[in-house]
Amino acid sequence: MTETTGTTTATTAVTSTPFHAGREGYASFRIPAVVTTRTPTAPVTTPVATPVTTPAPTLLAFCEGRVDSAADHGHIDIVLKRSTDGGRTWGPLQAVARNGNDLAGNPAPVVLDTGRILLVHVRAAAGATEDAILRGRVKPADGRRVWVQHSDDAGVTWSAPKEITGQVKKAGWRWYATTPGHAVQLGTGRVVVPGNHTLPPTGTDTGTEAKYNSGHCLLSDDRGETWSLGYVDENTDGYVNANETTAAELPDGRVYFNTRNDTGRSRPPRPQSPGNRADAHSADGGRTLVKPFRPQAGLVTPVVQGSLLQLRDPDLLLYSGPADPAARALMTVRVSADGGTTWRPAYTVDGLPAAYSDLVRVDGATVGLLYETGDFGPYETITFRRIPVTALT
């Protein structure tokens, strides 16, 4: 199979499809996130009597399993499939975060230096629609709340979930979401989970206006035991409206954030920022932003989520997302060699419908892309593609 890229032609891509809509007890699968396990590097506190065989890395593909329909509310579980052969085949489906018949969603997994996998996510009542939450018609107990759980055995079993809403969600915030896609652990050990929220409206506004969309991130300096808010980017002028956000640590230690910009929903006569992406940098591990989010017109996309991955050999920052500015289609990987300032297309998957995605480093020679796609619509499957690193350089 031959795939066209922005600069080269790749003939070694391998695809698999871990999730098909309408199968395995779920009407729809949405919101992919993917990580790979790794050997712990943190100090071992107990003596090891005999040599330990290092297990091969395991890929963990998460998404929302939507039981009754493709709607963003309702009975939704976070489900997982594991691959021990680099994404060529996948094990059985596991429901790893359930909220009864209510919602558990927006998976934000991150693999720590200890080998532990954190899964930050949100929970809400099944009937809490986005519109009702934005309008303030949902009581806090039924609204979007934040939880975390972990696995110490490469995703085979999971701890009970622990609520952290009080540590990371301010009173008055209405909508709330983590990532979607993987979170990151910085070289300092800090865990950074991008998020977004909405503010309560003023005047005669209803709360559904895009100008109330805002960005923030969650931070943990003790490997997920306790949490705090990092930067909070709130500006209701309607120019940049931060939504779903992804992050990567750059080689110089700065954190780069890239967000879906919902400025297209701003109402005249407010000026609209160019394009549908915005970005920002942090020089203090996500605690603050050097500047607020500003437009990133170098990434041509529709209004949609995207994913980031920083490679270190070579030093390239990757972005995945649809490249058709008017439709969720044309899944493409773009690359930046200057920390997100400029971008170029490097690898086009195909011209089919496509939407949300997540990137992962599979091994030294391979990047993985987990993405929503289909022949007649972007939400028919969640597919995994192995991409040679050489196709991105």
Describe these PLM feature segments.
Residues 6-47, 51-393:
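Asp-box/BNR beta-propeller blade signature and adjacent active/binding-site loops
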